[in-house]
Swiss-Prot record:
Ligand binding (NAD(+)): 73-74, 160-161, 188, 190, 198, 201-206, 225, 257
Enzyme Commission designation: 2.7.1.23
Entry keyword annotation includes Protein biosynthesis: no
Top EC category: transferase
Taxon lineage: Bacteria, Pseudomonadati, Campylobacterota, Epsilonproteobacteria, Campylobacterales
Protein purpose: Involved in the regulation of the intracellular balance of NAD and NADP, and is a key enzyme in the biosynthesis of NADP. Catalyzes specifically the phosphorylation on 2'-hydroxyl of the adenosine moiety of NAD to yield NADP.
A single BP term in Gene Ontology: NAD metabolic process
Identification of the protein by name: NAD kinase
Length: 301
């Protein structure tokens, strides 16, 4: 969605953890934004890292018009999850390596500051997945599929993907999958990615999944090292509600950043949320040019 967006006059900034070397870059970015009439507030944990004052995340999210991350895609994804409930636009300034989701490099910010102040930027909506964990101890599988009133023990969101992975180093994980409460398949594999289009260029692509245009509303199912060659990646509409049982102890990994244990007595219910994560980009950004650059498509080898 281009132009006619709210002008940005105050931004909160979060830095990649354990990166005190970002202090110089942050101060340069702060100066550029201040010169454009945009106030900059640093998050308190980031501030402690570089010995500057900051405010806690809730203050940032409630007082600022937008949030900027300084780091790579991982820093941006972490910030998006934290900012999701506040419905704030977010932008990534890339100091990492690949940077599919980040908007620009620090040295290019000066070309974009006037656009921020006038509201001339692109605001893209990214699908977000929610996982609910239900304990089904001593209850039959079929009965629990119909138990709509059960309270989840945990509720989580993912920007890129949820990964159900084997708990031990050896062996496979066996995962029963249902779509809209109907048994669909048993995956025998090292792990199963339940991903978003934005995450299709992350772990999903390494596991043989398709690249999906990031602003589509799809859910990706991609098995990792499946036991059977017929277990292929699957792209679904966002309307489906998915449920998974791991038949042995397993791990649920969220965006590669958090991990929880799941037991054979746990049911993992995953579906797309109607609310989206909002990412800001310069109005000139072209996704296919980004793909071409990052994957080096069209180059002679």
């Amino acid at each position: 969605m281009k132009s006619h967006n709210a002008p940005i006059t105050k931004v909160g900034v979060i830095l990649r953890p354990s990166s005190p070397e970002l202090k110089t870059t942050f101060l340069q970015i702060k100066e550029e934004l201040n010169n454009a009439g945009i106030e900059v507030i640093l998050e308190s944990i980031s501030g402690g890292m570089i010995e500057l004052l900051g405010r806690d995340f809730h203050q940032l999210a409630t007082q600022c018009d937008a949030l900027f991350s300084l780091g790579g895609d991982g820093t941006l994804i972490s910030m998006l999850r934290r900012a999701f409930e506040y419905e704030l636009p977010c932008m990534g300034i890339n100091t990492g390596r690949l940077g599919f989701l980040t908007a620009l490099m620090p040295q290019n910010l000066h070309t974009f500051t006037s656009h921020l102040k006038s509201g001339d930027y692109t605001l893209q909506k990214h699908l977000v997945l929610q996982a609910r964990i239900y304990s089904t101890l001593n209850t039959a599988y079929e009965n629990n599929l119909d138990n709509k009133n059960q309270t989840p023990t945990q509720t989580l969101i993912a920007i890129n993907e949820f990964l159900i992975s084997k708990h031990e180093l050896s062996g496979m994980v066996h995962i029963d999958a249902s779509i809209d409460r109907k048994y669909f398949n048993t995956y025998r594999c090292d792990g199963l990615i339940i991903g978003t289009p934005a995450g299709s260029t992350a772990y999903n692509i390494s596991a043989g999944g398709s690249v999906i245009y990031p602003y589509c509303r799809n859910i990706l199912l991609t098995p990792i090292a499946p036991h059977s060659l017929t277990q292929r990646p699957l792209v679904l509409s966002d309307e489906f509600m998915l449920e998974f049982y791991a038949k042995e102890r397993a791990k649920l990994i969220i965006d590669g950043q958090e991990m929880i244990d799941i037991m054979p007595s746990d049911r993992v219910q995953i579906q797309a949320l109607p609310q989206s994560a909002m990412l800001m980009y310069p109005p000139t950004r072209d996704y296919f040019s980004v793909l071409k650059e990052k994957f080096k498509w069209g180059e002679e080898h």
